[in-house]
Design a protein with these regions (language model features):
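Bilobed "Venus flytrap"/periplasmic-binding protein-like clamshell domains
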Residues: 1-53
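Sec/Tat-exported extracytoplasmic proteins
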Residues: 7-9, 27, 59, 74-77, ...
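Solvent-exposed coil/turn segments that connect beta secondary-structure elements
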Residues: 10, 68-69, 104
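Alpha-helix N-cap/helix-start motif
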Residues: 15-16, 63, 110
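Extracytoplasmic/secreted envelope proteins and their assembly/folding machinery
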Residues: 20, 49-52, 67, 110, ...
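A ligand-binding cleft/hinge motif common to bilobed small-molecule-binding domains
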Residues: 20-25, 54-82
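Short beta-strand->loop
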Residues: 40-41, 74-93
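An extracytoplasmic/periplasmic, membrane-proximal ligand-sensing/linker region
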Residues: 94, 100-101, 105-160
C-alpha cells in the first residue's frame, strides 16, 4: 500500500488480471477504490521482463509477473538479477495460454491440428517450450477459463 508497482501489461492474465482480481476479492480495490488509490504509482510494462526490470532499477517496489520468469533456469533473468528479487506472493493456478480455432474449422481438421500440437510434447519439446513455455494438454475449456472469466467480470466493476 502506498508504494509504486508495475504490472506486466494490461493484457496479461498472470501479470495483471489475476493479481487485481485477488486485490478486489480482498477489498483492497473495487468500484470505489482504484489501483492508484491503493498504490502510489501504477506502471505497465511490455511484458514480464520489463516489469521485473522496473523493480531491478528501483523505479517500483514490486511487480506482478508470471513465475516462469523467476523460477528455474530460463533465458529471462540471470542469477545475479534473481538474487536481487524475492517472491512476496503466489497466486494460482492461473489459466495458461489457450489455443483457439475458428468455429468453421471442421472437427477432423481440429483433430489434426490438436494432434500435431500435442506431438510436440514428445517430438520437439525444445520448440514447444520456446513457443508455449511448457507441456501442452487438452482441458475442459469452460472449467479452464472459469477463473479468467470471473476475473474479467470483476474488471468491469473496477474504478478506473
Amino acid at each position: 500500500k502506498g508504494k509504486p508497482v508495475a504490472f506486466a501489461s494490461r493484457s496479461s492474465t498472470s501479470g495483471y488480471l489475476i493479481p487485481t482480481w485477488d486485490m478486489m476479492k480482498k477489498g483492497l480495490i473495487g468500484s470505489q477504490k482504484s489501483l492508484t488509490d491503493f498504490f502510489s504509482l501504477t506502471l505497465y510494462g511490455t511484458g514480464y521482463v520489463s516489469a521485473v526490470e522496473k523493480v531491478l532499477s528501483g523505479e517500483v517496489e514490486a511487480a506482478a509477473v508470471s513465475d516462469y520468469v523467476f523460477k528455474g533456469n530460463n533465458q529471462y533473468l540471470d542469477d545475479a538479477q534473481k538474487a536481487q528479487l524475492r517472491i512476496v506472493q503466489e497466486q494460482g493456478p492461473v489459466p495458461a495460454h489457450t489455443l483457439c480455432a475458428r468455429s468453421t474449422l471442421s472437427q477432423s481438421d481440429r483433430k489434426i491440428l490438436q494432434d500435431a500440437l500435442l506431438s510436440m510434447n514428445q517430438g520437439n519439446p525444445e520448440l514447444r517450450d520456446r513457443i508455449f513455455n511448457g507441456e501442452l494438454i487438452v482441458v475442459d475449456q469452460d472449467k479452464h477459463l472459469e477463473v479468467t472469466r470471473e476475473a474479467l467480470a470483476f474488471q468491469k466493476k473496477l474504478k478506473p
